[in-house]
Amino acid sequence: MTAFKTILAKIKAYDTIIIHRHMKPDPDALGSQVGLKEMITSNFPQKTVKVTGYNEPSLSWLAQMDDVSDKDYEGALVIVVDTANRPRIDDQRYLNGNFLIKIDHHPDEDHYGDLSYVDTKASSASEIITDFALQNQLKLSDQAARLLYAGILGDTGRFLYPATTSKTFIIASELLKYDFDFAALARQMDSFPYKIAKLQAYVFENLEIDKNGAARIILSQKILKKFNLTDAETSAIVSSPGKIDTVQVWAIFVEQADGHYRVRLRSKSTVINEVAKRHAGGGHPLASGANSYSLAENEDIYQELKNLLK
C-alpha cells in the first residue's frame, strides 16, 4: 500500500480528525491545513473535522480556525501539516489524539508521528495535499482549491522560487479548473498595507550589504512600534533584499517582545540551512529560520553568511 493509500485508510477509519500546522502561519500552512479539512469534509461529510491554532489577523481573509476542546481529541486522528519539528507545532495538544500523522515538505530532521509522509521535492505542503487528493481521486470543493492554490503561490513566491517544479505547475493547473478567482487571490497576496510599504523603504535604506553580497537588516522593537507592525506582518518584506541584484544571501533579524530575535534567512543559490541549524532553527536549503539570543549572536550569524560567499 502506498503512503497516500495508507493515509487515506486512516482518514476513513476515524470519525473525528483534528488538523494542526506550524506557529505563525503563512499561506501554505493555512492553505494545506484548511484545504485538507475542506477536502475531507467534501468526501466524508459524516466526519467531524476541525482545524486548530492561532488565528493570524493578517491572513484572516484566507482562513479561520475552529474552536477545539480537549474532549475533541479523545479517540481522534491528528494530522500535522507543513511543520518540520515538534516545537513549532501550533497547539501542543497534538499528542492527545489516538493516532498522529505528519505531512510535510521540509527536510525530515524530526521524524515524529505514528505515520510520516515527507516529500522534500514538493514546493509546498499544499502541493502534497493536492497530489494526495488527485492520486486518490478525491473531490475538491472550490474553496479547497482556492486554499491549496494560495498555499502553493505562497511557498513558491508566485512560481519564482527554485522549489517550483514541472509537477508544481501541473498540480496548480488542476486547481485552476475550479471556480475561484485566482487572479484576485494573486492580487490579494501581492498587496500590502501602506505601513508595510514604509517598512520596505526602511529596509532598502538601511540594508547592510558586504562586498560579496551578504546582506542583513535588524528590525528592533522600536522600529516595529514606529511602523505599528507585528512580527508576523514583517513576513511581507522577507523577499525584498533579494530584489537587489548584488544581494546573494540575506538575514532579517526581528526582535521579539522578550528580547530574542527571530531570524529569517534567504538565499538565491547558496545553501544556508546549515547556518540556521547552528542557531536553533532549520528549514529549506534556500529559505530557513533561526533564533538569536543576543546582538553578538546576530553578528555571528551574519559572519557565517559572509563566510559562505568567500
UniProtKB/Swiss-Prot annotation:
Disruption phenotype: Increased sensitivity to superoxide stress inducers methyl viologen and menadione. Grows poorly in the absence of cysteine. Belongs to the NrnA oligoribonuclease family. It comes from Streptococcus mutans serotype c (strain ATCC 700610 / UA159). Probable bifunctional enzyme which has pAp-phosphatase and may have oligoribonuclease activities. Converts 3'(2')-phosphoadenosine 5'-phosphate (PAP) to AMP. Complementation studies suggest it also has RNA oligoribonuclease activity, although this has not been shown in vitro using 5- or 20-mers. Involved in superoxide stress response and sulfur assimilation. Its EC number is 3.1.-.-, 3.1.3.7. Its cofactor is Mn(2+); Mg(2+). The keyword Nuclease applies. The keyword Membrane does not apply. Signal peptide: none annotated. InterPro entries: DDH_dom, DHH_sf, DHHA1_dom, Oligoribo/pAp-PDE_c-di-AMP_PDE. Coiled coil: none annotated. GO terms for molecular function: 3'(2'),5'-bisphosphate nucleotidase activity; exonuclease activity; nucleic acid binding. This is Probable bifunctional oligoribonuclease and PAP phosphatase NrnA. Part of the SMU_1296-SMU_1298 (rpmE2) operon. Keywords: Exonuclease, Hydrolase, Nuclease, Stress response. It catalyses: adenosine 3',5'-bisphosphate + H2O = AMP + phosphate.
